[in-house]
Each structure stands twice: as structure tokens, then as C-alpha cells.
From Swiss-Prot:
The lineage of its organism: Bacteria, Pseudomonadati, Pseudomonadota, Alphaproteobacteria, Rhodobacterales. It is an enzyme of class 6 (ligase). This is Valine--tRNA ligase. It comes from Cereibacter sphaeroides (strain ATCC 17029 / ATH 2.4.9). It comes from the Bacteria. Catalyzes the attachment of valine to tRNA(Val). As ValRS can inadvertently accommodate and process structurally similar amino acids such as threonine, to avoid such errors, it has a 'posttransfer' editing activity that hydrolyzes mischarged Thr-tRNA(Val) in a tRNA-dependent manner. Gene3D superfamilies: HUPs, Isoleucyl-tRNA Synthetase, Domain 1, Valyl-tRNA synthetase, C-terminal domain, Valyl/Leucyl/Isoleucyl-tRNA synthetase, editing domain. The gene is valS. ATP binds at K637. Belongs to the class-I aminoacyl-tRNA synthetase family. ValS type 1 subfamily.
């Protein structure tokens, strides 16, 4: 069956992928022929996710490495999977429930809601898997993992318990990013900075105890004060006046002469009446604002740091919904008598409270002024609501105790991070690490394996000493309501059975009948109080200890998704079970990831794997850059410059998208992606297809079979292309081994399009009518086979389709052996001769183009001087040179005729007479005018780029564009100058 005229990507891609899957082509160990393993873990996309350009880029690079190793016979596993994406998934399901008019999460309860989440996951959670298949990702989908799979849950809970028991996990109060919409702590990665128009309010805080000071109000030219006024207040500036209710200090710089003598004194907080100290801290900048900074440790990360250094209290004045929490807040009222106006703010939304505080400040005379201010405000990336720094009780990993092995592993080379600059980022983060908040106030996720009970130990009741609670003692305990005020006590265990044993051990030390109580699980503290009181009341009636219960309730929070995904390498391979896969594929070979999650994911995987199994999770981390638009701008919906990879695949085919991303994947350099580039690489695929059709028309595929070794060749052209094939194989392998994906792609592009399609196909045409025809068919078939094999990791679809169409194959291309030949195939004589021929043709073509010789016009050429090797090469290839350089014939002369253009090649020179062919004077004038305009433009660009202010202040993409234009202009200028120089030789 003859080949189609063109490759139909839309039809072929689904058909070929289905064939690969049916053949088990991607399963772990498929095509393995050597003992070495290669394992790579997919960075698990969110189960809610859809394929974006970052996914497409990342997974293209992973697939290239996977297919390359699989074809080389490695026991290969590309482990796929999805992250349960706690907050994102919960948001999606809640939105779906609301859209369908169903009860909300809180109305239906936790268990019913989680059932709905699992239903959604089964119905809609596989979207990104199918999209990755469209890209051509050759993952072992039979092993597709999910971070909420039963085995993964066991791994996560086991690690939590182990780290807790080692003292690496603790519960404490710290400042966190709080999303008031979802009412949960979120990670820094889930926070986006939004620039907003706002105000800077200046507030006056009265000095306590009648204190005053001299404040400078006028200055000379050198900034020295010349006039002062007596003040009994300090002025502070804030963009968030509502937080002043939680102020616990004023910070001034210890070197600030205006305030140095006030350090240690106090001010009285307006509305609240709280006396707060003036403290010294370098955070206060004398050159900014008034130099005095209000400190609210519970609602600002910088203020928290000041508070920790200076011993200030932290008073939270907001609820989880970002409403003011004042009246029933003992921290707020402690040590002061808030005014009625302050207490009236209780329950107000933070923004309403802001308006009211400003109004009160103006009414009462402590508003010093208002300045318009444009500043950055952190927002939740999903809720789009302003984040509130919030002091809350959370679970933390004491990362300082487990971080050092992760630092040492990279420093000693157990794990290599590429490029090197990202290793520096890794070290910077880990060497300045803070405790990691791992609890989230969500329902979807790994519920924290901690249970709480009421502290009813001896301090909570009175026993007459007989080690038994009698009826009166129990009655007094119930009547006293001690349970309502009992502190919680807690234990951590893998499951309820394990935690029950720990609570039973505690109960054993209590008086009878409490020491006989059964541990039962309830939903909340309130239910625990009721159940315990009811059980004791019943015991007083029937004295049957078998009915006595001690209720415990589980921590409702779930773990940060980065905690579970931090176990991705070992969890997907079966840990904590000692599976064959874990023994065979761990540690994995390489992780390919984006720079934005080096800390959030990569560093945490390093820390956790080393803490849990004392092994690094991967030997290499390759950090790729961002995919930007063609102007270098970050893609965003607001800019309207987002390129959808699925739409690009629909339009250009997956191979073109993949090759574009690969060819532009220079290590550490962002990609500037354009549809024009993708279209160009689609044309590259078409070029290969057409070369195979040319081969078909010349009988190359008749009886053709796969041959590892090249055919024996005598024709110079065939010997030359066989050597070039050996060279490019070595180049590709060296590039991929060093993660220089762009070098591999560009080497293949230059070889397939340039050497094979442009030169070899043209050189071979005359040979099909000679005695070298059979040899040429065999050589062309072998060379095109190698093109398919070498291109397959980057362009899997078109190469697999060509492979099946162009001969009798014993197995699919995906499992065809990768070649091992190399530069030993190079024939020096053939290489030298054909390189000389190509150089001569290219020089003639370039000269013609530079001076605008009409493309179809055949010119005479004069041989001036030529060594013996050149004469032999010319004699053997004269017909080729005349045809491909569009020449009418060669003559020989001692010197160049008048009006001729000279061309130098190795071993000699030639001349092309141009008199009467072009108007040399007019052409020189045209070139000079074009060059003059170009040089003027280049001078402007050099001036801009030489201006430090432009380079420092202009957007990065604008500077990059200017540099690119200058580089392109300089290249064009060099070509124009060369053309002028050629014409000057003639005149």
C-alpha cells in the first residue's frame, strides 16, 4: 500500500497510542535487555488539572528520556500518578454541589461530602491522564498512582506517626497564611501577590505617663534638624488600620536619634487602652515613613519576627472568617479595658472594621493623615481573597532537625541539581528553613492521625484516697462541670486501635471505675463531654463499669498535600511494604521539574526520603525554565497570551509541539514560544515524510527490512552519509546524557533536514540510474531508518507511523534497539570530498543571494586555482555542482575576468562573472542604504542597552527583546557588509 501524501496527525496519534498500549509497550521492564534500570517519577499533576504548557514541556522532556532508555534496553519505569490536591479538589466539588442545587459541605457532613469527592474523582479525575496520552507520554499507566490510594495513605500515616514519635512533628502556635474564604492555612505557593490601589493611614499613639520628646520638623540642606516641636505622641503608618487592635509594641531603629531615648517607654493604644512598649529593632527603617512601626505579631509576618526578637505578645483579633474577634477573646481584653467603640467592632468584617477604625480615629483626633498608596497584597490563588496572616494552632514539622542530610546529599554529590544556579537556590532555602506548617483545615486529604481526649487526670477531681470514685465524688465531678473546662490531651497512632491502647494505658492509672472505661470514638469535643458525663451518670445509677466509656475525637484537620507528595518516590513504589519495585527502581534516576517547586516539593522529598529510608529519592534533579510567549512575557489569562497545548496539538500535531519544546529547551533559559516556530517544526516532520515518499518512489522500501549495521557502500555519497549518521548518533547520545535536550534536537534537525533531505536526497538522484542503484537504495533505507529511530524519542507518532509503512518490521519502533554505531562509520576520504562539494555549492549560493542574482538564472563559473584533491572532487561531482548551484558550466583561467565575484574554497578559488547580470552600482547603493538604516537602528538599541537605568528598571521581557533585536541586527549587518565587500572587489 503506497504512502499517503501527508502525515495525518489527527488520525494517526490516537491509533498509534492505542496500539502502543495494547502491546504493553510502556510497561515497566518492556524491551529490557540489560541489567541497568531507569526510573523517573512524573511530578503528579493535580487530579483537578488540565494540561498546560508547563505540563507539556515537563512531560515531553521526561518522555524523551524514558523512550531513549527503553530503546537502549534499560529496565525502564516512568511512574505516573495524580495528586489529590486538597484545597483545589474540595473547591471544585463544593462548586459542583452548589451548581446542582445540592446541600453544601457543612450541611451534608464530612462522611457524605467525602463520598461526593470520590464520586467526582472517578467521573472527572482522569482528564489530565487522557491529555498526557495525547501528548504521547509513555508512562506505565497500569501503575497509575493517586496520593489517596490505600497504600499511599498507609505510607503517609506511618511517616507522620514515626516523625511524631521521634519529636520531629509538633503542635504549636505560629503565624500562617490564612485563607478566610476556605478557612484554612495555605502554603506560600498558593499565595499570589496582587498590586492594589490603597491608602497609607498615619495614626497617633499617645505616650504613656505624660511623657514628651522633641521631634525635628525642619532640616538644612545636609539633612540636619534645625527646628523641633514638643510631642506627646508617636506617629505610625499602616495600610491595615483594623489590625491596630492587636498591636503589642512600637518598633524604632536603635540608631534613630529621634526615638532612641524613648526605647523602653510605653504608648497607650487608642480605643483599647492597652499599654504597649517602644522596642528597638533593626526592622524599623529611619528613612521610611515616620521611622516608628506599629507591631502586630499575630497579623503580620515581619511583625511576628520583631515580636519573637523583642518578646512582644501576639494577640489574634480576627476569626477564621476574617471578622473581628474581640468580646470573647481573653487575649484581647487581658490587662486593659477596651472602650465601647472598640467592642462594637466585634463581629465586623475586617474591611468594615477598617472603615470604622479610620472614622473613629478622625472623630477622636488621632488620625494624623492619609496618603494614597499602591502596594502588593497577598491573595489566595484559588479563592482570590486577600490572605490574612493569622496566629493559629497548627501541626508543624521541625524541619531544622531533618534538613541537614538533604543539604549534605547535594553538597557531596549523592544528588546533582542542574543547572548549578538552582542548586544555590536549594541551599539558600534549606539553610534558612522555617518550621513547616503541615495541617490544613479541610476535609479532603489525609486526616491527621491524632486523637484527643479530655484531661480527667487526678488534678481534675477529688478522691478521698481509696482509689475509687464513689457516688458522691462522681456527682460532684459532674455538677462541677469540670469536663467543660478540661484541657485536651492527645495521642498519635496509625489507627484507632493503636491510639485506644495508648489511652487505655493512661486510664489504667485512674481510680475505679475510670480505669475500666472503654475508649470510643466520637465526632467532636462537645460530643465527648456529653458522652463522658452520660456514662458517669449511668454508672451512678447501675454501677456497671462495662458501660463506662472514655470518648476521644480525631483531629479534623488534614495534611498539607506537599506532605503526601513528599513521599511520592517511595510511596508509588509500594513502601512501607518491601516490594520488588522498591528494591529495583529506588532511588530513581532523575527528577524533571520546574524551578518554582524546588523548595515546596524537591527539597521536601529529599528531607522526607532521607528521614524515612535514609536514601536520596533521585540521583539527578533537572530544573527546567518557564515557557513564555514569543515576546518573553509570562503566560496569563489576564494578558490573553496563553497557548493551550491541546489546541496546538489539534492544529500542528503532537510531534511538532514536542520538537519545538525540545529544540528550545536550553538549560536554564526560558522558552519564548510562538506558533510560527511550531509550524516550522511541523514542516520538519513533513520534510522527513517527503524524503520517505521519495525513497518509496525509487523502490527503496521494496523488500526492505530492519538492519542494525549499515550496508557496504562504494559510492562516495553513500559512504559520506553513513559516516554522518554515525556522527549524529554520538551527538544525540552525548546531548541527552547531559540533559542538553536542545542540542539533541538541533543536531537531529541539522542532520535530517540538512544532510539527509537537502543534500543526500539530491546527491542520490543520479545514482538511481547507475550501477550504484541497489547500493543507494540499501543506504537510503538504512539512513532513513536511523532518522526514524533517532527522532522517535522526540517525535514518536510520525516516526512510528513511518516505521510501520516503510518496510517489513519485526517489532514496533518504540521497542526497536537504539543504535550503538558512531564515528567509526566515518570514511575520511568521502567525508572530505563531500564536505568540499557542499562548501562550494553553499558559497556560490550565498554569493548569488547576497548580490541579488535572479534565482533561476544559470551562471558560468571560472576555475582560477585548484589543488589536486579539489580537481578530483570537481571532476567526480561536476554534474551535481552545476545542477545544485545553478551553473551553466566550468571554464579555467589564470585570473578572474572583469566584473567577476571571487569565491574561495579549500584548496583553491573560483570566479563568477556578473557583468551584464546585475547593475553593480545600483546594487551597491541599495545595500549601502539598507546597511545605513540598520546601523542607525542598532545604535539606538546599543544606547538603550548601555543605559543602566533601562536595564535595571524596564520589564525583563522588554530588555530581552531589545537584546534579541540587537543580536539579529548585528547578524544582518554582517551579511550586508559581506555583500558590499564582495561588490567592492568587482568595481
Amino acid at each position: 500500500m503506497p504512502m499517503d501524501k501527508t502525515f495525518n496527525a489527527a488520525e494517526a496519534e490516537a491509533r498509534l497510542y492505542d496500539a502502543w498500549e495494547k502491546a504493553g509497550a510502556f510497561r515497566a521492564g518492556a524491551n529490557a535487555s540489560r541489567p541497568e534500570t531507569f526510573c523517573i517519577m512524573i511530578p503528579p499533576p493535580n487530579v483537578t488539572g488540565s494540561l498546560h504548557m508547563g505540563h507539556a514541556f515537563n512531560n515531553t522532556l521526561q518522555d524523551i528520556l524514558t523512550r531513549w532508555h527503553r530503546m537502549r534496553g534499560f529496565d525502564t519505569l516512568w511512574q505516573p500518578g495524580q495528586d489529590h490536591a486538597g484545597i483545589a479538589t474540595q473547591m471544585v466539588v463544593e462548586r459542583e454541589l452548589a451548581r446542582a442545587g445540592n446541600p453544601g459541605r457543612r450541611e451534608m457532613g464530612r462522611e457524605a461530602f467525602l463520598e461526593k469527592v470520590w464520586e467526582w474523582k472517578e467521573q472527572s479525575g482522569g482528564t489530565i491522564v487522557n491529555q498526557l496520552k495525547r501528548l504521547g507520554a509513555s508512562c506505565d499507566w497500569s501503575r497509575n498512582a493517586f496520593t489517596m490510594d490505600p497504600n499511599f495513605q498507609r505510607a503517609v500515616l506511618k511517616v507522620f506517626v514515626d516523625l511524631y514519635e521521634k519529636g520531629f512533628i509538633y503542635r504549636g502556635k505560629r503565624l500562617v497564611n490564612w485563607d478566610p474564604h476556605f478557612e484554612t492555612a495555605i502554603s506560600d505557593l498558593e499565595v499570589e501577590q496582587v498590586e492594589v490601589n490603597g491608602n497609607m493611614w498615619r495614626l497617633r499613639y499617645q505616650l504613656a505617663d505624660g511623657a514628651t520628646y522633641r521631634h525635628p520638623v525642619a532640616f538644612d540642606e545636609e539633612g540636619r534638624p534645625t527646628e523641633w516641636e514638643e510631642r506627646d505622641y508617636l506617629t505610625v503608618a499602616t495600610t491595615r488600620p483594623e489590625t491596630m487592635l492587636g498591636d503589642t509594641g512600637i518598633a524604632v531603629n536603635p540608631s534613630d536619634e529621634r526615638y532612641a531615648h524613648l526605647i523602653g517607654k510605653e504608648v497607650v493604644l487608642p480605643l483599647v487602652g492597652r499599654r504597649i512598649p517602644i522596642v528597638a529593632d533593626d526592622y524599623a527603617d529611619p528613612s521610611k515613613g515616620t521611622g516608628a512601626v506599629k507591631i502586630t505579631p499575630a497579623h503580620d509576618f515581619n511583625d511576628w519576627g520583631v515580636g519573637q526578637r523583642t518578646g512582644l505578645r501576639a494577640i489574634n483579633v480576627m476569626s477564621g472568617r476574617a471578622t473581628m474577634f474581640l468580646i470573647e477573646n481573653p487575649d484581647f481584653t487581658e490587662g486593659c479595658a477596651p472602650s465601647e467603640e472598640a467592642l462594637a467592632l466585634d463581629g465586623l468584617d475586617r474591611y468594615e472594621a477598617r472603615k470604622r477604625v479610620v472614622a473613629l480615629a478622625e472623630e477622636q483626633g488621632w488620625l494624623d493623615g492619609i496618603d494614597q498608596d499602591r502596594h502588593m497584597v497577598p491573595h489566595g490563588d484559588r479563592s482570590k481573597v486577600a490572605i490574612e496572616p493569622m496566629l493559629t494552632d497548627q501541626w508543624f514539622v521541625d524541619t531544622a532537625q531533618i534538613v541537614q542530610p538533604a543539604i549534605d546529599a547535594v553538597r557531596t554529590g549523592r544528588t546533582e541539581i542542574l543547572p548549578e544556579r538552582d542548586a544555590k537556590t536549594y541551599f539558600h532555602w534549606l539553610e534558612n528553613i522555617e518550621p513547616w506548617c503541615i495541617s490544613r483545615q479541610l476535609w479532603w486529604g489525609h486526616q491527621i492521625p491524632v486523637w484527643y481526649g479530655l484531661d480527667i487526670w487526678p488534678a481534675r477531681f477529688e478522691d478521698d484516697g481509696d482509689d475509687t470514685l464513689d457516688e458522691v465524688e462522681i456527682f460532684e465531678l459532674l455538677e462541677d462541670g469540670a469536663f467543660n473546662h478540661a484541657d485536651p490531651t492527645h495521642h498519635c497512632a496509625f489507627d484507632f486501635e493503636g491510639v485506644s491502647e495508648k489511652f487505655l494505658d493512661d486510664l489504667a492509672s485512674l481510680p475505679h471505675p475510670l480505669n475500666n472505661a472503654r475508649v470510643v470514638e466520637v465526632a467532636s469535643r462537645a460530643e465527648a463531654i456529653d458522652r463522658l458525663a452520660q456514662a458517669l451518670a449511668d454508672y451512678n445509677l447501675n454501677e456497671d463499669p462495662t458501660h463506662l466509656v472514655y470518648p476521644v475525637w480525631r483531629d479534623p484537620d488534614v495534611l498539607d498535600t506537599w506532605f503526601s507528595s513528599g513521599l511520592w518516590p517511595i510511596g508509588t513504589l509500594g513502601w512501607p511494604e518491601e516490594t520488588p519495585e522498591l528494591a529495583r527502581y529506588f532511588p530513581t534516576n532523575v527528577l524533571i521539574t520546574g524551578f518554582d517547586i524546588i523548595f515546596f516539593w524537591v527539597a521536601r522529598m529529599m528531607m522526607m526520603q532521607l528521614a524515612v529510608v535514609n536514601e536520596v529519592p533521585f540521583k539527578t534533579v533537572y530544573v527546567h525554565a518557564l515557557v513564555r510567549d514569543e515576546k518573553g512575557k509570562k503566560m496569563s489569562k489576564s494578558l490573553g497570551n496563553v497557548l493551550d497545548p491541546l489546541e496546538l496539538i489539534d492544529e500542528f500535531g503532537a510531534d511538532a509541539v514536542r520538537f519545538t519544546l525540545t529544540a528550545m529547551a536550553a538549560m536554564g533559559r526560558d522558552l519564548k514560544l510562538s506558533t510560527a516556530r511550531i509550524q516550522g517544526y511541523r514542516n520538519f516532520g513533513t520534510k522527513l515524510w517527503n524524503a520517505c515518499r521519495f525513497a518509496e518512489m525509487n523502490g527503496v522500501w521494496e523488500g526492505h527490512g530492519t538492519q542494525a549495521a549499515p550496508p557496504a557502500a562504494t559510492a562516495t555519497v553513500n559512504r559520506w552519509i553513513i559516516g554522518e549518521t554515525g556522527r549524529v548518533r554520538e551527538e544525540v547520545d552525548a546531548a541527552l546524557a547531559a540533559y542538553r535536550f536542545d542540542s539533541a534536537a538541533n543536531a537531529l534537525y541539522a542532520f535530517v533536514w540538512g544532510k539527509v533531505c537537502d543534500w543526500y536526497v539530491e546527491f542520490s538522484k543520479p545514482l538511481f540510474d547507475t550501477e550504484a542503484a541497489a547500493e543507494t537504495r540499501a543506504t537510503m533505507g538504512w539512513v532513513l531508518d536511523q532518522c526514524m529511530v533517532l527522532l522517535h524519542p522526540i517525535m514518536p507518532f510520525i516516526t512510528e507511523d513511518l516505521w510501520a509503512t516503510t518496510g517489513s518490521r519485526t517489532k514496533m519502533l518504540v521497542h526497536t534497539d537504539w543504535p550503538s554505531f558512531g564515528a567509526e562509520l566515518v570514511d575520511p576520504a568521502a567525508d572530505r570530498e563531500m564536505s568540499w562539494v557542499i562548501s562550494l555549492i553553499e558559497e556560490i549560493r550565498s554569493a548569488r543571494a547576497q548580490v541579488h542574482v535572479p534565482a533561476g538564472l544559470k551562471l558560468p563559473v571560472v576555475q582560477l586555482a585548484l589543488d589536486a584533491a579539489g580537481r578530483e572532487a570537481l571532476a567526480r561531482n561536476e554534474a551535481l555542482i552545476l545542477r545544485l548551484a545553478r551553473l551553466e558550466g566550468f571554464t579555467e583561467a589564470a585570473s578572474a575576468p572583469k566584473g567577476a565575484l571571487t569565491i574561495a574554497v579549500e584548496g583553491g578559488s573560483f570566479a563568477i562573472p556578473l557583468e551584464g547580470v546585475i547593475d553593480i552600482g545600483a546594487e551597491k547603493a541599495r545595500l549601502a542604504k539598507t546597511l545605513e538604516k540598520l546601523e542607525k537602528d542598532m545604535a539606538g538599541l546599543r544606547g538603550r542597552l548601555g543605559n543602566p537605568n533601562f536595564v535595571a528598571s524596564a520589564p525583563e521581557e522588554v530588555v530581552d527583546e531589545a537584546r534579541t533585536r540587537l543580536e539579529q541586527g548585528e547578524e544582518e549587518g554582517a551579511k550586508l557588509s559581506a555583500a558590499l565587500a564582495r561588490l567592492s572587489e568587482i568595481a
